[in-house]
Each structure stands twice: as structure tokens, then as C-alpha cells.
From Swiss-Prot:
GO CC terms, sorted: nucleus
Protein name as catalogued: Type 1 phosphatases regulator YPI1
Domain of life: Eukaryota
Functional summary from the UniProt entry: Regulator of type 1 phosphatases which maintains protein phosphatase activity under strict control.
Family annotation (InterPro entries): PPI_Ypi1
Composition bias type Low complexity, residue spans: 1-40, 90-99
Amino acid sequence: MSSAAPRSQQRQQQRQPSRPAPSQTETTPSTTPQTHTQPQAILRLRGAHAPTGRSVQWRSDVVDNEGLGRKKSKVCCIYHRPRGVDESSDSSSSSSSDSSDSDSDADSDSGRASGSGKKTGDGNHKQGHAHDCDGHHSHRGSRGQGKARRKRRPSPNAYEKMPRYDKPGKDGDGDGSGGSGEGKGKGVPGQGPQGA
């Protein structure tokens, strides 16, 4: 019978509605002050990485020939200001254009136009330059063959060209119809000399 008694107690506990247990709040005064110590945040800044690529450094006396805020990388075509007689010059930057810039431009332009640059047997050419270089860069009009070329008149650009119209009065009536041969009846009705 002993086994029947615990079963009946379990059934009675299950049948009874559950009641909430009374709760108690107990506060204890603390005599020691509590301090919350948080670790301090450390911010470390690092500088930008140095660029590893090559960069070109121009001398202060190199002139921007194009006026576009950039300098050419072709060493033989960069203008270096003329040096005085008393100034020293090293062999790497010496050039034969030490006279004046306008004279050297006129000489080089006339040399290009007259075809004075003839190719030699080894392929090097001096294209009427006013400066020393190896001659392995392109020039306008350097097609060579040694023939003298006539200087061509410069052609006007698109803004300077006037549009071509048919010449008025090809058929002789003088009405400005463009000489189509159709007579005076061509065009938009109600406009022109017909309505007058």
C-alpha cells in the first residue's frame, strides 16, 4: 500500500490549481562602494603608405611648352631656357638651341617644309632640328624620300568654311530658285514673290 499512497498525493497535487508563490524582496546595504572599471579605448592612427610607383621630378627651369599645366616627357623636345655665357652647363642638358626660341622655331619649320631632312643609310635623320637628339621621334612631313615639297596653303577648319549653295539663276530666270528649271512655282505656297 505504500506504493499507492505516493500516487494519490501526486494526483492531488495535479488536481489543485497552482498558486503563485509569495515573493519577498530583501535589500542589504552595502558598505563597500562598487566601482565598475572599464578598459580605456586606445585609438592608434597610422600614416598613409608611401607610393611605391615611379614618379617624374622636373627641374625647376623646365618650361611647360604647351601651356596645359603638364610637361612633356620627351627630353629632346622640352625647351630649356638659354644659358648665359658665364653659366655652366653639363653635357646631358646641352643643346644647340641656345640662341633664341623664335629663331630656332623658324629654322625647324622651314627645314620641315623644304624637305631638308634626308634619311641616311643607318636610319638616323636630323629633321632640321634646332636641338640635338637621336632623331627617333616623329615629325610632321617627315615622309622623307628627299624630294622638295611645296608648302601647302593651310586649309580652313570647320568653323571657317562657308557652306556651298547652288548658284542662283543657273537657268537664267534670276529668281533664286537654284536653277532647278521648274520655274517660279517651287517652294512653300503663300511665300515669296508669287503672293505679291
